[in-house]
């Protein structure tokens, strides 16, 4: 299963939940806007926390897509 993580920086409100929840996958720039550190997380823990961050993001900027192939 492949996971792809992306973030729409134009809708990010800088809440920081992504970086706090999944620090191995997300960070924030100097303005507090999300940055993706790992677009295809492989570690189980990073995948789990990326999913959680996607659910917690208040603006919907974080997107997590999983392929079953």
From Swiss-Prot:
Q: Which InterPro entries match?
A: 3Fe4S_ferredoxin, Divergent_4Fe-4S_mono-cluster, Fe-S_cluster_ET
Cofactor mode of binding and number, as noted: Binds 1 [3Fe-4S] cluster.
Keyword Ligase, does the record have it? no
What drives induction of this protein's expression?
By herbicides.
Keywords (A to Z) from UniProt? 3Fe-4S, Electron transport, Iron, Iron-sulfur, Metal-binding, Transport
Residues annotated to bind [3Fe-4S] cluster:
12, 18, 57
Gene Ontology molecular function terms on file: 3 iron, 4 sulfur cluster binding; electron transfer activity; iron ion binding
Q: Which cysteines are cross-linked by disulfides?
A: none
**Keyword check for Iron:** yes
The cofactor(s) it depends on are:
[3Fe-4S] cluster
Tell me, what does this protein do in biology? Electron transport protein for the cytochrome P-450-SU1 system.
What is this protein identified as?
Ferredoxin-1
Q: Which organism is it from?
A: Streptomyces griseolus
């Amino acid at each position: 299963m492949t996971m792809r993580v992306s973030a729409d920086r134009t809708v990010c409100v800088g809440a920081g939940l992504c970086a706090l929840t999944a620090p191995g996958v997300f960070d924030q720039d100097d303005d507090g806007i999300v940055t993706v550190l790992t677009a295809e997380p492989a570690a189980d823990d990073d995948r789990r926390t990326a999913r959680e961050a996607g659910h917690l993001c208040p603006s919907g900027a974080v997107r997590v897509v999983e392929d079953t192939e």
